[in-house]
Swiss-Prot record:
Catalyzes the attachment of serine to tRNA(Ser). Is also able to aminoacylate tRNA(Sec) with serine, to form the misacylated tRNA L-seryl-tRNA(Sec), which will be further converted into selenocysteinyl-tRNA(Sec). It is found in: Cytoplasm. Homodimer. The tRNA molecule binds across the dimer. This is Serine--tRNA ligase. ATP binds at residues 262-264, 349-352. L-serine binds at residues 231-233, 285, 385. GO terms for biological process: selenocysteine biosynthetic process; seryl-tRNA aminoacylation. Belongs to the class-II aminoacyl-tRNA synthetase family. Type-1 seryl-tRNA synthetase subfamily. The keyword Nucleotide-binding applies.
Length: 427
């Protein structure tokens, strides 16, 4: 959430930032709401002060046996109480109107984010690894998985409908191995603390990270009002909600391997075959909580941690910076890491690493107190996939496929596979 004080002082900056995102100007509307609220608050405060003063004057008039004045003051206090009973409710309503309006405004892109309308305007930063030249036509992961007998979309559809997968045998173990490998890397070498968070959260948590109120259609909700997490970013970031964290302990770095649940609203017709776009999938998430001065450097560090996963797996990838029109709602800047999929002959996103500034910290009311200062500041937050486990499985299958349809297991994963070096067709 943006600071209304900042918006009052920088209306043109806000509207220019919204224009970069392809959105209409909103500063005038927001400032008008704020002025209406501030004017009303002024009236309420004046009425409260007069009520308190008149109440004291009643006592003085009674002591002086000036009953006429006392009665007039009592009548005035009664009128003020009646006014305040309605006015304080109006104040809450006006404050909510402003808060609701602010909650739908996206974050302000950093100055170095490239301008653009959509993913075609994203800017490539680097490529690591060269795509393998196959001596045969490489297959897509779902062709390989079904031929091996370990990937079953038909039974998954029978159980749950479209966009689900059943993995069996060594492919199920390979997905588990990938998640464990990523967690071990991030916790033992990258300094992240592993967390096993709830998979269902309250409204406040999803609001804090920015999925609510604007993107509720992308989420699954239980009958008792909880939300299935679309990413572990939600519970990990909200660990510090409504808290003042010790600045000496910053940065806080959390990681988790969880199922994620998404309705994929608006994705009709996209990636309908295979595991690329699922309602349920595994992902390793990284979250950092920092002070204001450290978040830019932390963004580079987090992205490097995600890239290291793919380097260890020997998977070719590229890193791009998203343009203003392709960034997520809460991000100030986002790096996408795209892995090479030879079956599709293209790069596909496998990780997205974003710095959000104090946007989420303000929504969560998560703060820290700089050393030597009495006042607090909102924390800066960052999140990144480290990485999407299902997509990593896809990438391993396609990049390590053999002409006979078997899958070579990358060396980094073999210790997690009981020494198995190849996945072959089920007997």
């Amino acid at each position: 959430m943006l600071d209304i004080k900042w918006i009052r002082e920088n209306p043109e900056t806000l509207d220019k930032a919204l224009a970069k995102r392809g959105a209409a100007p909103l500063s005038s509307e927001l400032i008008a709401l704020d002025e209406k609220r501030r004017e009303h608050v002024g009236k309420v405060q004046a009425a409260q002060e007069r009520r308190n003063a008149a109440s004291k004057e009643i006592g003085k008039a009674m002591a002086a046996k000036d009953m006429g004045t006392a009665e007039k003051l009592k009548a005035e206090v009664g009128e003020l109480k009646d006014f305040l009973a309605h006015a304080e409710e109006d104040e809450r309503r006006l404050s909510k109107e402003l808060s609701d309006a602010l909650s739908t405004i996206p974050n302000i892109p950093l100055d170095d984010v490239p301008l653009g309308k959509d993913e075609s305007d994203n800017v490539e930063l680097r490529r690591i690894g060269n795509p393998h030249n196959f001596s045969f036509q490489p297959k897509e992961h779902f062709e390989l998985g079904e031929a091996l007998g370990y990937m079953d979309f038909e039974r998954a559809a029978k159980l749950a409908g479209a966009r689900f997968t059943v993995l069996k045998g060594p492919l199920a173990r390979l997905e588990r191995a990938l998640g464990q490998f990523m967690l071990d890397l991030h916790t033992t070498e990258h300094g992240y603390t592993e967390v096993m968070p709830p998979l269902m959260v309250r409204d406040e948590a999803v609001y804090g990270t920015g999925q609510l109120p604007k993107f509720s259609e992308d989420l699954f909700r239980t009958t008792d009002g909880r939300w299935l997490i679309p990413t572990a970013e939600v519970p990990l970031t909200n660990l510090v909600a409504e808290e003042i964290v010790d600045m000496k302990g910053l940065p806080l770095r959390f990681t988790a391997l969880t199922p994620c649940f998404r309705s994929e609203a608006g994705s009709a017709g996209r990636d309908t075959r295979g595991m690329l776009r699922q309602h349920q999938f595994l992902k390793v998430e990284m979250v950092s909580i920092t002070d204001a001065e450290s978040s830019v450097a932390e963004h580079e560090r987090m992205t490097a941690c995600a890239e290291e996963v793919l380097k260890r797996l020997g998977l070719p990838f590229r890193t791009v910076v998203l343009c203003t029109g392709d960034m997520g709602f809460g991000a100030q800047r986002t790096y996408d890491i795209e892995v090479w999929l030879p079956g599709q002959n293209t790069y596909r996103e496998i990780s997205s690493c974003s710095t959000c500034g104090d946007f989420q910290g303000r929504r969560m009311n998560a703060r820290y107190r700089p050393e030597g200062e009495k006042s607090t500041r909102f924390v800066h937050t960052l999140n990144g996939s480290g990485v999407a486990v299902g997509r990593a499985l896809i990438a391993v299958m396609e990049n390590y496929q053999q002409e006979d349809g078997s899958i070579h297991i990358p060396e980094a994963l073999q210790p997690y596979m009981g020494g198995l070096t190849r996945i072959e067709k089920a007997a």
